[in-house]
C-alpha cells in the first residue's frame, strides 16, 4: 500500500494529520458563500476505516458541526470505503446498508460497496447513495465494463426506491470516475441534460 511507512509515499503520523487538516479545511469552507452553517450532509470516498473519519470530525476546523458518521466496512481488497458525514441537527438517519458491487463474469472481483442511507433532511424523507465507481486504471475502454456494472447497481438501487415510492427523493453522490457523456452515465444511469437552450 502506498500510504504506509514502507509505501511509495512514506506515510507517517505527520503526513496523516496534515491530510486530516487539509480535508477539514476544505469541508469548513464548503457552501460558506451560501450559508454560514456549511454542509449538512457530505458523502466521502477513499476512506480506510472509521478511525480516520473520527479523527476528521474531531478536527478543530469542523468539530463545532458535531458531524456523525455512517460507515460500514466493505468488500474492497484495499479496505477503501464510502461513508457519509451528517449534521444531526439537520439530518436523521433512519436506515443504511452497504451494497456490494459484483461482476457476474468475474467472481473474484472486489470493489467499493455503494452506501445507501435513508433519512430525514430537515424533516423530509431523502435517500442518499454514496458511490466510488471503479477507476480507469488500465485504460478507459478496458475498465469501462466495471463502471457500467457499477452504474447498473446504482440504477437498480434508485429503481428499487422509486418502485416503493415513485416520488422518492434520491441523491447519488461520490466519485463516478466517468464523464457525464460516458456510457455509464448516459445509457445506464439515464442521465441527460435538462438545461437545453
Label each PLM-derived region with a short phrase.
Residues 147-197:
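Metal-dependent phosphoesterases centered on the DNase I-like endonuclease/exonuclease/phosphatase
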Residues 1-66, 70-80, 151-152:
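N-terminal, active-site-proximal structural segment of metallo-dependent hydrolase catalytic domains
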Residues 45, 131, 174-175:
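Active-site flanking residues adjacent to catalytic metal/cofactor-binding acidic residues
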Residues 2-3, 124, 129-143:
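Active-site His/acidic residue clusters
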Residues 37-41, 64-67, 122-126, 165-170, ...:
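Loop/turn elements at helix/coil->beta-strand transitions in domains of secreted/extracellular proteins
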Residues 21-27, 108-118, 152-159:
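A Trp-anchored, charged/polar loop motif used as the substrate-binding/catalytic surface
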Residues 7-8, 113, 136-139:
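Flexible glycine/proline-enriched surface loops and loop-helix/loop-strand junctions
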Residues 47-127, 133:
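Structured beta-strand-rich core segments of catalytic domains in phosphoester-bond hydrolases
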